[in-house]
Amino acid sequence: MIIPVRCFTCGSLIADKWDAFSTRVRAGEDPGKVLDDLNVKRLCCRRSLLTHVDIIREVVNYTRPI
């Protein structure tokens, strides 16, 4: 839903890289090259960014007002 602030495995900060990563991948760049450019080297951090599914916009439509 929301990108984790830190990697679940190693605790490295990854949320600050999400906007740049998702923008560049949507523009058609290779995800591996983008992660290399963003200096994401650990496999656990790469996995967290590569496998994240951003569905928050879809879920917001189903929440009830308080």
Swiss-Prot record:
GO cellular component, one term: cytoplasm
Pfam families to which the protein is assigned, alphabetical: RNA_pol_N (PF01194)
HAMAP family listed in its UniProt record: RNApol_arch_Rpo10 (MF_00250)
EC numbers: 2.7.7.6
Gene that specifies this protein: rpo10
Name of the featured protein: DNA-directed RNA polymerase subunit Rpo10
Gene Ontology BP terms: DNA-templated transcription
Function statement: DNA-dependent RNA polymerase (RNAP) catalyzes the transcription of DNA into RNA using the four ribonucleoside triphosphates as substrates.
EC category: transferase
Oligomeric and partner information: Part of the RNA polymerase complex.
Cofactor note as given: Binds 1 zinc ion.
Subcellular location: Cytoplasm
NCBIfam families documented for this protein: PRK04016.1 (NF003089)
Record-linked PANTHER family: DNA-DIRECTED RNA POLYMERASES I, II, AND III SUBUNIT RPABC5, DNA-DIRECTED RNA POLYMERASES I, II, AND III SUBUNIT RPABC5 FAMILY MEMBER
Family: Belongs to the archaeal Rpo10/eukaryotic RPB10 RNA polymerase subunit family.
Gene Ontology molecular-function annotations: DNA binding; DNA-directed RNA polymerase activity; zinc ion binding
Binding sites annotated in the UniProt record for Zn(2+): 7, 10, 44-45
InterPro entries: RNA_pol_su_RPB10, RNA_pol_suN_Zn-BS, RPABC5/Rpb10
